[in-house]
Amino acid sequence: MLRKAVIMLGASLTLACGAFAVGVVPSGADSGSHCSFQHVPNLSPGVSYNSTSGTFTDPGGGTVDCKGAVSGSGDYTDSGTYSNATCQSGGTAEGDPTFTINGQTFTDHVKIVFGKEPPHFPKGLVRATFEGAKVKGTIDLMPTKGDCISSPVTQIKGMGEFDMK
C-alpha cells in the first residue's frame, strides 16, 4: 500500500514537472530530433493523499541532450501548474519549458497526464506522458523531498525523453 502511494505521488509530481522539462521544443525546428532530459523541480504546496493543485518551478540545473535536426546539449528552466494531484491517483499538469541548445532557445506549452503508462524503474515511481504543439514524450518521476505519508512530496527528479514534431 505504501509503495502504491509513493508511486502515485511520484506520478503526480512527475506530471507537474514533466510538463516543464519535456514541453520545450525549438520553434521552427525541423522534425526528427530526439531528446533526453532531466531536472529537479519544486512543488508548492506539494502532493499528498488529499487532492491538491499548485505550481511547480525548476530552480535551474536541468539538462537536455538532442540528436537529429536539433543536435547538442544544453540546459532548461520551466514552470507550470498541476491539478487534482494525489499520491494515489495522479493528476494533470501544464507547463512552459524553455531549453537552450547551442545558443538557440526553444519553448513550448505542454499538457501532462500522469499514470497512462506503467513506471520504468529505477528511473521513477510514476510515468507521465506529455504533448505540446512542438514536442511529445514521457517523463519518469521519483520523489526527492517528502514521502506522501509523513510529509507531502515537494520535490521530484524527472528523467524523460521527447521527440520534436
Task: Label each PLM-derived region with a short phrase.
Residues L9-G10, V25-S27, Q104, H109, ...:
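Compositionally biased, intrinsically disordered low-complexity segments
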Residues P41-K134:
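Predominantly extracellular/secreted and cell-surface proteins with exposed
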Residues M1-P26:
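Secretory targeting and sorting signals
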Residues S33, V64, N84-A85, K145-D147:
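Extracellular secreted precursors and ectodomains with disulfide-bonded cysteine-rich loops/domains
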Residues E131-K165:
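Extracellularly exposed regions in secreted/surface proteins, prominently low-complexity, repeat-rich
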Residues L9, L13-T14, C35, T154-I156:
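A short, structural micro-pattern
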Residues S27-P45:
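Short N-terminal segments immediately surrounding and downstream of signal-peptide cleavage
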